């Protein structure tokens, strides 16, 4: 079995043009303060209020790559962290979007996190505390998040009861 590492072009995740965003309060300064210490962010708001646009705007403003994942009930932990794939040369590891973000120092935006299953969201826990690590159990690797990595999650207020699963 051969295992090859992925080479990632960080520029593909950077937002080239400024996304339109109209500030409605202190959210820009609050986000920047949280980013300065790489504090994970949780953004709550109704559908269509601009949560995703806000995160895109902040990634652009900070000049950081952004990897967005639209969460859903069929998403597995492997969809987030990665999996082994077979090809003509054997087996290779393919990083998932969360792993890629942690490796390259991107902002990882998990949109509608409460749509994901509890057994999927549990993988984010060590990235949200002082450890800032991501265990890749299938690969036997523990990734220390890049110093620029930040996790941002969002949800709609109607799904608040589901937050019990990610607390």
Where are each of the predicted segments found?
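AAA+ P-loop NTPase catalytic core and its hallmark functional loops
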Residues: 1-167
């Amino acid at each position: 079995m051969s295992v090859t590492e992925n080479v990632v072009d960080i520029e593909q995740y950077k937002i080239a043009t400024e996304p339109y965003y109209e500030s409605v309060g202190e959210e820009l300064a609050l986000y920047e303060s949280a980013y300065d210490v790489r504090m994970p962010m949780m953004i709550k708001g109704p559908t269509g209020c601009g949560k995703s646009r806000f995160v895109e705007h902040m990634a652009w403003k900070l000049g950081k790559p952004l990897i967005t994942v639209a969460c859903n009930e069929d998403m597995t932990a492997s969809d987030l962290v990665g999996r082994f794939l077979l090809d003509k040369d054997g087996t290779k590891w393919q990083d998932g979007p969360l792993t890629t973000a942690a490796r390259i120092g991107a902002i990882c935006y998990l949109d509608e996190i409460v749509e994901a299953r509890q057994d999927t969201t549990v993988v984010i826990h060590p990235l949200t505390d002082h450890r800032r690590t991501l265990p890749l159990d299938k690969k036997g690797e523990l990734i220390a998040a890049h110093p620029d990595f930040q996790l941002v999650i969002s949800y709609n207020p109607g799904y608040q009861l589901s937050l019990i699963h990610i607390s």
